[in-house]
Each structure stands twice: as C-alpha cells, then as structure tokens.
C-alpha cells in the first residue's frame, strides 16, 4: 500500500508559531540541512494520516514527542506508538529513506530498557531536542555482564 503526500492547508498545520513542535522541526531541519514540515497523507481508501515532519523530497519522515514538565509513564506509550507509525509510514511512502523520532530531553526517560534498542534494530533514528538544538541520542550504556 502506498500513501500519497498531500499539500497541507497551511505550512505549519496545527503547530503554532513558537510552539515546541515547530522549534523542534526547525532545529532538526537545520541539522539535516533540509526544511521539515507537517503534511497530511492519503491512504488508498481516502482516509488521512498526518506525518509531523517530512522534507520536500519525501525522504525523511519525522514524528515528535515534545512533552515538557513532569515525566509521566504514559509518555513511553506515545514513544512506542510513534515508532510503530514511523515503521508503517516508511514502508508506505515509496520515497522514504529515513525515519526519525525526535524527542525532548524529558522523554529520553521513556527510551530506557529495550525501547531504544528496538528503535535502533528497526532503523528508526532517535534525536533529542534540548530546547534549542538537536543531537542524535547517545547510545545508552550497558551494564557489564559476566558470563560463566
């Protein structure tokens, strides 16, 4: 199944000027050297889904988890849902080459255990927004395990 990328009604869709989501996309676009904007996509049956960031060539797909404030365990579910969405979108947009999950520093907590490893194994890049710039997630340290 292939999705069709549609023109958005406005350049930034639901991301208001000054919103954390807009700042996140601008910072990631600066890092990658390509503008990223939210876009609606149409499925063959006419239903729609939005990707929170995509470049003009439709090669880079981005989902954002930009929550601020106190950490809530439910944020881990949002991370996993967005990873699942990115996998599907990468397979459904014929030109897609990269799938990036961009998270705020707060959300890094949700990437503990197997979640970050699964993202890496599935080819999903994780980047972290620190409030002004974006950098790839540093590999999580692994405890030394001595095997007999």
Tell me what each language-model feature is.
Residues 1-43:
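Acidic-basic catalytic patches of nuclease active cores, encompassing PD-(D/E)XK
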Residues 47-49, 84:
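Alpha-helical scaffolding within the catalytic cores
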Residues 51-64:
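Active-site beta-strand-loop-beta-strand hairpin of nuclease catalytic cores
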């Amino acid at each position: 199944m292939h999705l069709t990328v549609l023109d958005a009604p406005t350049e930034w869709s639901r991301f208001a000027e000054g919103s954390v989501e807009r700042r996140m996309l601008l910072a990631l676009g600066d890092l990658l050297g390509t503008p990223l904007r939210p876009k609606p996509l149409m499925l063959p049956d006419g239903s729609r889904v939005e990707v929170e960031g995509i470049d003009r060539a439709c090669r880079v797909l981005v989902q954002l988890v930009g929550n601020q404030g106190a950490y809530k365990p439910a944020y881990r579910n949002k991370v996993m849902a967005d990873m699942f969405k990115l996998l599907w979108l990468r397979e459904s947009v014929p030109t897609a080459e990269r799938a990036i999950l961009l998270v705020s520093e707060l959300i890094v907590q949700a990437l503990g255990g197997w979640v970050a490893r699964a993202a890496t194994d599935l080819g999903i890049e994780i980047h972290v927004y620190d409030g002004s710039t974006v950098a790839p997630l540093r590999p999580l340290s692994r405890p030394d395990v001595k095997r007999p």
